[in-house]
Amino acid sequence: MSRGDETLPYDSDQGCYVSLSPVNTDRIRAVLHGHDLNFGQSSEEELAVPTRNAVYFWNTSNPHILQLRAHWRGIATDDAQFASLVEEVRRCNSTRTGPKAYLAPFEDGRRYGLIAECDIVATNGLSEAQLDAFFETSMSMIMGFFSDLEETLSDFVTWNEEGDHE
């Protein structure tokens, strides 16, 4: 006995199959509005959400993957700070289930930033519940990681609670 289209995910809480929709900037825009977040268009396929300690980029350019990538505001300007960032990236990637962390060299080749990223496979689209859950979990994981960074690497923090440089 069939309960419906078995190719769609079944939501046991609602007792029905839920539809999947392609992920695009319009859907991300609706999620961000729903959470009262300020954001701008970074490109046709990417929205940027500035916060006090990072800029979060919601990227829909790959039709198979939805990516949330956040650039932390802390910057390594010397060898000791670079080594500290390397250690924090290593620690994040070896002890946390997410986000994935990596270093990002600046164009001058002498300074480095840190990026944290969460991805979800979206080849068949995502339901509203899946998109909301990805928003909640990925934002929480990245924000928690950045909060820990600010505690561990307090000398990197050059901004105040409002996000202005001190």
Regions inferred by a protein language model and the residue ranges of each:
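A short, surface-exposed beta-strand/turn
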Residues: N62-H64, S138-M141
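Charge-rich, low-complexity N-terminal segments
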Residues: M1-N62
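Generic recognition of long tandem-repeat/solenoid scaffolds
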Residues: E45-P50, L68, L114-A116
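A short acidic-to-branched-hydrophobic micro-motif
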Residues: F57-A76
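Short amphipathic alpha-helical signal-transduction/dimerization elements
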Residues: R90-N93, M139-F146, E150-L153
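A short acidic/glycine-rich loop-to-helix N-cap element
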Residues: A122-T137
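Short, highly charged C-terminal tails/helix-capping segments
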Residues: E150-E166
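Short, internal acidic amphipathic alpha-helical interface segments
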Residues: W72-E117
